[in-house]
C-alpha cells in the first residue's frame, strides 16, 4: 500500500534588493527640466522676455551711455531751451483731449445702440466702426482735404453761408484732437457695447421707479456698473494717442505744434541724427505712458468690488426714445456723414484727379482712372502689397503660436514664475510704437545679424507690438 503525503509548497525567494543609491539633486532637476513640455515653455518664455526687454535695455543704454561712459547730455539737447514744458503741454492736451472726445462719442453711441430703440441701427453700427478700418494716415489726409483753411471742402461750403467769418482749421491742436478722437472712438464703442450688453437694465428701471431722474441713474447706477470697461477704454486711448504719429506729423508740424512723437521724428531727420536726444525723448514718452497706466490702475482699484448676475434667459430690453427718436436719427445720420461718408468721398474724389482742385463741372468731366493705372504699373506697389500680405500673415501666425503656449502656461500650468511671463507679455502695451521702433533700431544697428533694413526687423517689431493682444 502506497502512502501519498502532501508536499509543502516551495518558498519563493525574492530577488535580491539592490542597494539604495541616492540620486543626486542636480540630476533630478536636470531630468525634470529636459522634458519636451518644459523645453517648450522655456523657449516661449525666452522669446517673450527677449522681445519685451532687449529693446528697452538697448534704448536705455544708448540714451545714457556713449563712447566716453555715462552721460545725460541727450536730455539737455532734447529738453533744453524750455522745450520740455511745451512738449508736455501739447502731448497731454492732445492725448487727454482725444481720449475725452473718443470716450464721449464711443460710450454715447454704444449706449444708444444697445440700450435704446434707436433708428438706423445697421447704419449706426457701420458708422461706429468704419473709422477703425481706415488707416490713420488716410483718415488724417481726408480731413486735410475737408477742413484745411486753404483747400478744405467744408470751408468752401460754409464760407458763403458765414461770409467767411468762420473758417475750420485742422492744422491746430483742436484739429489734431478732433481727428484722433474720431478715429479712436470705434475702440471705445466696441468695448462699451460689450459692457452695456452684459448689464441688467432692471437695475436702472428699479432706480427710476424709486424716484431717481435719468441723470441720477446714469451717474449712480449705469456708469459704476461699466466702470471697468470705461477705465480700460481710457487706458487704451491714452496710450494710442500718446504714440500717435500720423496726426501730429501731418497736422501739427505745419503750425509748429510738437508732441513727443513728432519731436522724435524731427530729431532723427536731422543730420547727423542725434540718437541720444531721440532716446531721451523716447524715455520721456515711455514715462508718460507708464504714468497713464498707473493712474488707470489707481482709479480701477475698486472697480471689481461688485458684480451683477443674470439668468440664462436674460435679454436687455431697449429703452423707448419716444419723441426724441427723430432727433437721435438726425444725429446718427450727421455722425455717419462726418465720420465715414465725407472722408471716404473726398479720398475717392481726390484719387480720380491728376491734381487737387475744388469741385466743379469742369473738374468732374476731367476725372479718370489714370492714377490707379499708374499705381498698378509701379513695381514698388506690387512689392509693397506682397510685403504687407507676408507681414500680416506671418505676424498673426507667429504671435498666436507663441502666445497660445504662453496663455496655457499662465492659466493651466502650475509652473513657478508663470506670472512673470504674463507681466512680460503686457510690457509692449505701454511702449509707444515710435519708442519701440527707435529701441529696435538701437538693437539691430549694433547687432552682427544683418537684418536692419530688411523685412525681418519689421516682423520682429510687429510681433513685439501685438504680443499683448494674443495673451
Predicted regions and their residues:
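Short glycine/proline-centered loop/turn elements that form peptide/ligand docking sites
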Residues: 199-202
Amino acid at each position: 500500500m502506497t502512502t501519498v503525503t502532501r508536499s509543502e509548497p516551495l518558498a519563493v525567494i525574492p530577488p535580491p534588493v539592490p542597494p539604495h543609491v541616492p540620486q543626486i539633486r542636480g540630476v533630478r532637476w536636470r531630468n525634470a527640466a529636459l522634458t519636451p513640455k518644459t523645453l517648450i515653455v522655456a523657449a516661449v518664455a525666452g522669446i517673450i522676455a527677449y522681445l519685451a526687454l532687449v529693446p528697452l535695455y538697448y534704448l536705455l543704454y544708448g540714451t545714457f551711455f556713449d563712447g566716453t561712459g555715462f552721460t545725460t547730455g541727450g536730455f539737455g539737447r532734447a529738453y533744453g531751451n524750455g522745450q520740455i514744458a511745451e512738449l508736455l503741454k501739447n502731448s497731454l492736451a492732445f492725448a487727454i483731449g482725444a481720449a475725452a472726445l473718443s470716450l464721449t462719442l464711443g460710450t454715447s453711441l454704444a449706449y444708444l445702440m444697445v440700450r435704446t430703440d434707436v433708428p438706423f441701427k445697421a447704419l449706426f453700427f457701420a458708422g461706429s466702426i468704419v473709422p477703425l478700418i481706415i488707416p490713420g494716415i488716410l483718415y488724417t489726409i481726408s480731413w486735410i482735404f475737408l477742413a484745411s483753411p486753404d483747400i478744405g471742402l467744408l470751408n468752401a461750403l460754409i464760407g458763403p453761408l458765414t461770409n467767411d467769418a468762420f473758417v475750420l482749421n485742422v492744422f491746430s491742436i483742436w484739429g489734431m484732437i478732433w481727428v484722433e478722437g474720431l478715429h479712436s472712438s470705434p475702440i471705445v464703442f466696441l468695448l462699451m457695447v460689450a459692457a452695456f450688453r452684459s448689464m441688467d437694465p432692471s437695475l436702472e428701471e428699479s432706480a427710476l421707479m424709486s424716484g431717481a431722474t435719468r441723470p441720477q441713474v446714469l451717474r449712480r447706477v449705469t456708469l459704476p456698473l461699466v466702470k471697468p470697461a470705461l477705465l480700460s477704454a481710457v487706458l487704451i486711448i491714452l496710450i494710442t494717442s500718446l504714440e500717435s504719429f500720423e496726426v501730429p506729423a501731418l497736422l501739427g508740424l505745419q503750425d509748429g505744434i510738437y508732441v513727443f512723437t513728432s519731436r522724435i521724428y524731427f530729431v532723427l531727420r536731422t543730420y547727423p541724427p542725434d540718437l541720444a536726444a531721440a532716446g531721451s525723448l523716447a524715455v520721456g514718452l515711455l514715462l508718460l505712458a507708464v504714468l497713464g497706466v498707473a493712474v488707470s490702475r489707481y482709479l480701477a482699484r475698486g472697480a471689481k468690488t461688485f458684480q451683477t448676475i443674470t439668468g440664462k434667459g436674460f435679454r436687455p430690453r431697449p429703452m423707448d426714445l419716444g419723441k426724441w427718436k427723430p432727433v437721435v436719427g438726425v444725429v446718427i445720420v450727421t455722425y455717419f456723414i462726418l465720420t465715414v461718408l465725407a472722408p471716404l468721398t473726398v479720398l475717392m474724389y481726390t484719387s480720380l484727379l491728376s491734381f487737387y482742385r475744388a469741385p466743379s463741372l469742369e473738374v468732374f468731366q476731367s476725372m479718370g482712372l489714370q492714377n490707379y493705372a499708374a499705381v498698378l504699373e509701379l513695381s514698388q506697389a506690387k512689392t509693397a502689397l506682397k510685403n504687407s500680405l507676408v507681414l500680416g500673415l506671418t505676424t498673426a501666425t507667429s504671435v498666436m503660436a507663441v502666445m497660445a503656449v504662453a496663455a496655457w502656461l499662465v492659466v493651466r500650468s502650475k509652473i513657478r514664475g508663470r506670472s512673470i511671463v504674463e507681466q512680460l507679455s503686457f510690457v509692449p502695451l505701454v511702449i509707444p510704437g515710435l519708442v519701440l521702433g527707435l529701441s529696435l533700431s538701437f538693437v539691430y544697428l549694433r547687432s552682427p545679424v544683418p537684418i536692419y533694413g530688411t523685412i525681418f526687423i519689421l516682423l520682429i517689431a510687429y510681433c513685439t507690438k501685438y504680443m499683448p493682444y494674443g495673451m
